[in-house]
């Protein structure tokens, strides 16, 4: 998606060899026009979606934007922590390693919010090694839903997440796909 690639070139910051900081327009402050355009592009790539699933927190805005494109279908987000109001035994759970934080989280979704046979689209802000998406896939399989695909705003293709998901048979769409970082700039994937 040209407008996202342009924004990444203008405002994205590369840290080291594998981190792209986009907090000024995706995952701390959100550019709402960009969000709307990304959401529209995602919705155009998938059909017959009953529900959208993401993981807290940065994927939520893009999941909601995409859900609005599908006539306001529900969005469910996996939580990274427990609380007094959630009975952990009534949740589907999976362990997920955070690439940027280097920690492992047990994510969970209340069983009431995933219905067997539902067609579910996973939406997130980033795809790197694929850990978050694979954790959501695990939960959605436990719930016996049908996974329509995985859609992300930004993909760092060189980290292998897409391949893992495609090897499992899932369709993957990214609004901006990066093959590498070279001379402090992202090199965007061209089909």
Question: Residues of each region from the PLM?
Answer:
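PRPP-associated nucleotide enzymes
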Residues: 1-123, 127-191
């Amino acid at each position: 998606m040209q407008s996202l690639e342009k924004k990444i070139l203008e405002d994205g910051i590369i840290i080291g060899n594998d981190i792209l900081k986009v907090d000024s327009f995706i995952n701390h402050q959100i550019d709402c026009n960009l969000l709307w355009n990304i959401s529209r592009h995602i919705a155009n790539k998938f059909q017959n979606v009953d529900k959208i699933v993401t993981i807290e927190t940065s994927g939520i805005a893009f999941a909601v934007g995409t859900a609005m494109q599908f006539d306001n279908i529900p969005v469910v987000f996996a939580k990274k922590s427990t609380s007094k109001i959630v009975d952990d035994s009534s949740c589907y759970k999976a362990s997920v390693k955070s690439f940027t934080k280097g920690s492992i989280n047990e994510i969970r979704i209340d069983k009431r919010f995933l219905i067997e046979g539902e067609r579910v689209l996973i939406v997130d802000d980033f795809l790197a090694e694929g850990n978050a998406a694979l954790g959501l896939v695990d939960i959605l399989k436990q719930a016996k839903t049908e996974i329509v695909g995985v859609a992300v705003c930004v993909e760092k293709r060189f980290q292998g997440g897409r391949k893992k998901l495609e090897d499992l048979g899932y369709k993957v769409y990214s609004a901006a796909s990066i093959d590498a970082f070279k001379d402090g700039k992202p090199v965007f994937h061209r089909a």
